[in-house]
Amino acid sequence: MATVEVATELGTVVTAVGPKAKDEEEEEEEEESLPPCETVRWAPVGAVAEAGPGAATFSEAAAAEEPGAAPGSPSDATVRTLRRLEAERRQLDSALLALSSHFAQVQFRLRQVVRGAPAEQQRLLRELEDFAFRGCPHVLGYEGLADPCGGDESDVLPGDRPRVRGEDQSEQEKRERLETQREKQKELILQLKTQLDDLETFAYQEGSYDSLPQSVVLERQRVIIDELIKKLDMNLNEDISSLSTEELRQRVDAAVAQIVNPVRVKEQLVEQLKTQIRDLEMFISFIQDEVGSPLQTGGHCECQASGKVGIGSTRVGGSTLPPGPGKAKAEDAKRARETGLHLMRRALAVLQIFTVSQLGCATGQIPQTLWQRSQADRDYSHLLKRLEVSVDRVKQLALRHQPHDHVITSANLQDLSLGGKDELTTVVRKELTVAVRDLLAHGLYASSSGMSLVMAPLACLLPVFSSAPETMHPWELFVKYYHAKNGRAYVESPARKLSQSFALPIMGDTAVTPKQSLLTAIHLVLTEHDPFKRSADSELKALVCMALNEQRLVSWVNLICKSGSLIEPHYQPWSYMAHTGFESALNLLSRLSSLKFSLPVDLAVRQLKNIKDAF
């Protein structure tokens, strides 16, 4: 029943309103159908239909107050109405512009959602929702905000007296309106910035914008600046707004100087120390050149050719002074001369063999035992077998005696006689070193001047061949390598001497190479054993013990094997060294590389040094 009553009331209202609206439409059509001359002129908007006595009085008073006004000029009410209409139109235009911009942003974000990746669509939809319900900003603001001092003249009635500007506005209201206007402007600026960032980001993602968006660039620059401020220990958050550009530059320079200046001071100190060390080395070299080594005694030169003075040396009273600055050139010339002599010796040997084979006058006089003995000497299998046995025995003893148990101190060595050494040291010195020595000595000989070309044709007249070439101890190979590489100059360099004097690490942080360690070891063995005239076997044993202690036996022997200037002139072509390059022996010795040894090095001269110290 209630529903029927409501429907009945609504129908009554519609029937009541319908004819009335219809009458108004008919009146408008009739007015539009009249010609323009017969249309009724409408009163201005806001004007009173009938002017009362108060209005006439006000008009007369206004005319009296404005004597210069023309009689046909529009009234103040009309002017105010036109101004209000213009203001409303501007407001509507600005609102329409803001609404259109808002719709354009919504369309732009919708396009981003459609073109975006599936993983990003949910986030873009949430951002679109927030933006759509945020509202559109008013571009020009309200009319009252645009002219805060103009007053609200639109509400003035035509019959009332116009109020003076600012009469109804206090200072507080003006300030409030200004603050409101500023807030609106800030919101507008913030929204425009956001829209600009979104547009740059979209253009950059689409590829139509080459550079990064300004927001991304500013963010990265801010990160860099924050890190620099943190590293430089600067506090600019408090007074950065009150400082000028020059003052900021000075503060940054001061902060950078606090970090850079200590580094520069250290670099200058290092350069000064390097200069002082270089000057000291030059001074030591100058003193060595001035003083020189003691003159050689005996009245003869220790050159290969007796009675001849080497290149770069000077004869003074039967003695030979050391070479001067041309020492390196003299050594190069000497090396070239030795190479030439070696080639000449080989050529002479080939010519001699050719002559003897062609003449054939002394072939019957060659003893057969000589060839048999030579063929027997060329076999090195038993030497390799002996080396393998000695390596295995040393390895077994080394594994049995752990490094912490096998430490021979000086106190224990003083109580030991030469025959009372431990078993591992004995095996290393008497078996392993001997096996290495014999294998290195296979086919090793000392280079000689050879037979003269004049004596070659007379070889057939000799009853037998000349004696075999002079043998050479393997230790002499290490000594020749030491001299060829200028080992004494390296070990006794001023820099190493200064480092030893000040207890500084000789090589610093750099690793010691096998070549440097070998030169140092040979120099140590020579300086300890030569004053006591020890044999080459003793010196080789000391070197092998030192190599085992430093785990460099394979690398040191390999350096000798790879030295062509030593191998070619001192080894026969059939020797084990020239035939195999000592490869299998190095493989056997490598079994000891992972073991740690602490063998005595100066065992052969320890008692002699103790006797010397006692006296």
UniProtKB/Swiss-Prot annotation:
The modification Phosphoserine is found at residues 73, 499. One of its GO terms (biological process) is in utero embryonic development. Residues 423-604 form the RUN domain. It holds the Pfam family RUN. Keywords: Coiled coil, Phosphoprotein. Residues 158-180 have a biased composition (Basic and acidic residues). The keyword Phosphoprotein applies. The keyword NADP does not apply. Residues 24-33 have a biased composition (Acidic residues). This is RUN domain-containing protein 1.
